[in-house]
């Protein structure tokens, strides 16, 4: 919906970036009267850094957002101009859907969805302060003096919280280039007792594509058959483009080394820690100086935009040095720089200050999502925003929080990592972070999470119908393949080599064999040809993983039993004999809610965990004894 003069809401979301859009949409879908506070409507959904969505691990998050009826997957499908399925030759569990996006199309598609959402009102203005009474959030004060009342706030400030841009020795207070930072909120968060830290991220210079020598470059094409992110997308209709590939050279490295003292990163100007997996070009040269070159992907920012994003040369060097660097890179020797690269520092809060609902422990009704929690990336932000929005709506209405377990989704893995371990650098999602990644595949996100969205009341009617139709088709195909059987002797007539043990095997069993798919089995059972392509792919993947999934289910059951063992809020940590003072301090500081969370506290040992479990059991005995005594006295 458009802007409103109303001042009373159930939920207020501060920030119109990727976390804020998902939070506002989710809260509104959950039935909360929601305000999205942002400086300007036309900056909603802006891609501040790279023009891409998805990738390894990140693509899983986008699919999970979509499965919960979030926005990012559908928006990316409307704006994607180079779809590629990463790790296509590897197993389905580690494949990563990705697309480059047209910045303008992405922004406009997101704004369209925000404007169309019932219960959602956009309030243009800056958030200056938070209102709190007796440890509970009550509202937001805008920079123009207006006060908005609410039952919960979701803070999604991105890089705007005390944001400071660095270009060489130049320092510019900003949330991103050309936009003012959020200053008052940091002071209020400090007054609440939160300890703020500083993190850093960076972006490369933007180039004029008309001045790049594309003919001298290797080119990378999109997939011939683009794989959409969203269940709601039938096919990709946006024209697909190529990207250029080039590399830094020894001359590039020489220019950088000669000017390291002028880099904000290496001159001591920047206090914040940057993302390890997205290093600046200065970092690459210093840490990997033995390499003769580093790859650069030249990514056009839009179908009708000449701006090019050179992915791989993020930098905080001065503008003149950036120009000298470009002259040493093949294909970029005469490239014009439209905007210099820069580093940006911003405040964040230790995510161990959060519950797994993403509500802060110190202030009831205050939720945090995105880079303020120490993460990096649009996808990580969007996933947190969606969960925070759901729980903010439930907090405002008096409902119980929704906790997504790490056994259920990459969202659960990320939130559990953040709230139990904290961050020492910007957190990025990888498939390797998930213990149960065979179960948490991108292709089965809908099966894992859409029933939850339905239960929570945030699932749209059209998606529910499509999901149920897909599940029905899969159930029917599974039943069909399980009903069709063949002996090893007969299978040999169709060039299927099976163990000659006389055991009949079903078509479903055969799909778990290497190089056997439904196309091959159609020669035996022609009726399999009626299975549609989407169902066929889902069935083949399911059958391939069936044996491994059964094993993983038992492992998940063990972890879930641990998750269910709650640590009572009144447990006397200091009274645990044999537990080190250091661990007592950490447990009191972080206040884990379950044994599984306590297990991930730094320094926790099996022996210490056993002491904690014993104390919980003693606490339970005392509670039961006190209850029985009270009941006995009442009866007397």
UniProtKB/Swiss-Prot annotation:
NAD(+) binds at residues 274-288. InterPro entries: FAD/NAD-bd_sf (IPR036188), GIDA_C_N (IPR049312), MnmG (IPR004416), MnmG-rel (IPR002218), MnmG-rel_CS (IPR020595), MnmG_C (IPR026904), MnmG_C_subdom (IPR047001), MnmG_C_subdom_sf (IPR044920). Its cofactor is FAD. It comes from the Bacteria. FAD binds at residues 15-20. SUPFAM superfamilies: FAD/NAD(P)-binding domain (SSF51905). One of its GO terms (molecular function) is flavin adenine dinucleotide binding. It is found in: Cytoplasm. Keywords: Cytoplasm, FAD, Flavoprotein, NAD, tRNA processing. Its main location: cytoplasm. Disulfide bonds: none annotated. The keyword Cytoplasm applies. GO terms for cellular component: cytosol. The keyword Flavoprotein applies. One of its GO terms (biological process) is tRNA methylation. Belongs to the MnmG family. NCBIfam families: mnmG_gidA. Homodimer. Heterotetramer of two MnmE and two MnmG subunits. NAD-binding protein involved in the addition of a carboxymethylaminomethyl (cmnm) group at the wobble position (U34) of certain tRNAs, forming tRNA-cmnm(5)s(2)U34. This is tRNA uridine 5-carboxymethylaminomethyl modification enzyme MnmG. It comes from Brucella anthropi (strain ATCC 49188 / DSM 6882 / CCUG 24695 / JCM 21032 / LMG 3331 / NBRC 15819 / NCTC 12168 / Alc 37) (Ochrobactrum anthropi). The gene is mnmG.
